[in-house]
């Protein structure tokens, strides 16, 4: 299998993580156990996941002209990701995610900052790179008109797209049509498409269900791929790891095989702290799959 060329158009954030035993209710103050800042953002996370798994990855995004922005760009470059399409925005803060981590679960508030400047005009400067991609990954932490523009462009140029519709937001009908694959989690799928997505949409859906695995449709027949049982430390980046790994594996076999590979990568990712901290290499995923019976 040739090394895939993957372009990620999406968010780049600094994750500000507070670890606590108790989640405060309204008006309550509780003591936290620890505080950490770690690189994140759904776009950047998926880019790192794909790069760790051996893909050639380009990130298209924006950061603030601030200390966080410099750290975030350097972090991507350190992972081998092409960053000449990540440019700072003057007089704007970098995107930030405030994460409350408790009992190995998480709650997240995202402040978009420079991610709001990932506009169609900005991305249009990289159309040549988009057209040369094997897979383009998108999420919904950047302006929705940009997502719709990229999906339309890629559909016209026969480039495979994976749209991770998180956080769940409505897009024009044409955007869903233009996407090759749509990868919501169970809650996002229900919010966006209801209990019974139409037949055309079902063929695109790769629905993640946490510990219950992944569900998709093949020739209108429901297929369920079980998850791998592990003891999680931090689930923050599991979905992003899944999406990056799914994009990497798409060119090497069936959708079911790509989902199983992505499930294995996600299982490994939750065993370390931080969205990117536990993202595995291709060798680690292959070794894990062998241990699990191939």
Swiss-Prot record:
Localization per record: Cytoplasm
Keywords of this entry: ATP-binding, Carbohydrate metabolism, Cytoplasm, Kinase, Magnesium, Metal-binding, Nucleotide-binding, Potassium, Transferase
A Gene Ontology term for the protein's cellular component: cytosol
A biological process term (GO) from this entry: D-ribose catabolic process
Main localization (coarse): cytoplasm
Pathway per the UniProt entry: Carbohydrate metabolism; D-ribose degradation; D-ribose 5-phosphate from beta-D-ribopyranose: step 2/2
Inhibition and activation profile: Activated by a monovalent cation that binds near, but not in, the active site. The most likely occupant of the site in vivo is potassium. Ion binding induces a conformational change that may alter substrate affinity.
Active site, UniProt feature: 240 (proton acceptor)
EC nos: 2.7.1.15
Class of this enzyme: transferase
Cofactor requirements of the protein: Mg(2+)
Quaternary structure, from the entry: Homodimer.
Its biological purpose: Catalyzes the phosphorylation of ribose at O-5 in a reaction requiring ATP and magnesium. The resulting D-ribose-5-phosphate can then be used either for sythesis of nucleotides, histidine, and tryptophan, or as a component of the pentose phosphate pathway.
NCBIfam families: D_ribokin_bact (TIGR02152)
Protein family according to the UniProt entry: Belongs to the carbohydrate kinase PfkB family. Ribokinase subfamily.
Listed HAMAP family: Ribokinase
Protein name: Ribokinase
Native source organism of the sequence: Halalkalibacterium halodurans (strain ATCC BAA-125 / DSM 18197 / FERM 7344 / JCM 9153 / C-125)
Gene name as annotated: rbsK
